[in-house]
């Protein structure tokens, strides 16, 4: 049986940074090839990088949010591209702006079907939201690590709120441990 931790896959990394000064987004949008800026639809300028694939949301305040990256390394690489593009436009950017990972979304697979009704009862209502008429997944809020896991009947998981990739591994360990204690997992992990 495959170890569920071996199935963990990073789906999205969101990080934030800033250049410490306000920007004229209209002007930046005209000079930055490939930039999308439609302030009636979204207050930020969107600049997409292809390699690595991500989107930088650049705001008038100078704050920048990078989303869509598949690793923390990709976030840093993507933002370095954005910083270089801004420098080319004569916009001063520090040599090494601080980049903060805000959220890592991962997927995993426990490798077996889950009885979500039994899990909801077994884990107790204080950390669980399960309304199958509204959403097919069970929402499990973990304290340590501080993440939210979505459990689906197929055994698939989505873990969100992590700040580092190891948070997903810790969450899978906690979930396997709790479900095993309750006798709700057949696998021997």
From Swiss-Prot:
<dbReference type="InterPro" id="IPR000814">
    <property type="entry name" value="TBP"/>
</dbReference>
<dbReference type="InterPro" id="IPR012295">
    <property type="entry name" value="TBP_dom_sf"/>
</dbReference>
<dbReference type="GO" id="GO:0006352">
    <property type="term" value="P:DNA-templated transcription initiation"/>
</dbReference>
<dbReference type="InterPro" id="IPR030491">
    <property type="entry name" value="TBP_CS"/>
</dbReference>
<comment type="function">
    <text>General factor that plays a role in the activation of archaeal genes transcribed by RNA polymerase. Binds specifically to the TATA box promoter element which lies close to the position of transcription initiation.</text>
</comment>
<feature type="repeat" description="1">
    <location>
        <begin position="10"/>
        <end position="86"/>
    </location>
</feature>
<dbReference type="GO" id="GO:0003677">
    <property type="term" value="F:DNA binding"/>
</dbReference>
<feature type="repeat" description="2">
    <location>
        <begin position="101"/>
        <end position="179"/>
    </location>
</feature>
<keyword id="KW-0677">Repeat</keyword>
<dbReference type="GO" id="GO:0003700">
    <property type="term" value="F:DNA-binding transcription factor activity"/>
</dbReference>
<dbReference type="Pfam" id="PF00352">
    <property type="entry name" value="TBP"/>
</dbReference>
<dbReference type="InterPro" id="IPR033711">
    <property type="entry name" value="TBP_archaea"/>
</dbReference>
<keyword id="KW-0804">Transcription</keyword>
<comment type="similarity">
    <text>Belongs to the TBP family.</text>
</comment>
<protein>
    <recommendedName>
        <fullName>TATA-box-binding protein 1</fullName>
    </recommendedName>
</protein>
<keyword id="KW-0238">DNA-binding</keyword>
<keyword id="KW-0805">Transcription regulation</keyword>
């Amino acid at each position: 049986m495959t170890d569920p931790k071996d199935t963990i896959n990073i789906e999205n990394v969101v990080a934030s940074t800033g250049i410490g000064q306000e920007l004229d987004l209209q002007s930046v949008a005209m000079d930055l090839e490939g930039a999308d800026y439609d302030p009636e639809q979204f207050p930020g300028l969107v600049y997409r990088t292809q390699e690595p694939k991500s989107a930088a949301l650049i705001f008038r305040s100078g704050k920048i949010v990078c989303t869509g990256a598949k690793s923390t390394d990709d976030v840093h690489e993507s933002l370095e591209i954005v910083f270089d593009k801004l420098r080319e436009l004569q916009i001063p950017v520090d040599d090494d702006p601080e980049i903060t990972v805000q959220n890592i979304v991962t997927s995993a697979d426990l490798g077996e079907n889950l009885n979500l009704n039994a899990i909801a009862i077994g884990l107790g209502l204080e950390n669980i939201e399960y309304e199958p008429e509204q959403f097919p997944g069970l929402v499990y809020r973990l304290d340590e690590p501080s993440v939210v896991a979505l459990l689906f009947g197929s055994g698939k998981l989505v873990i969100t709120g992590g700040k580092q990739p190891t948070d997903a591994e810790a969450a899978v360990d906690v979930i396997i441990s709790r479900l095993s204690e309750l006798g709700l997992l057949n696998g021997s992990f």
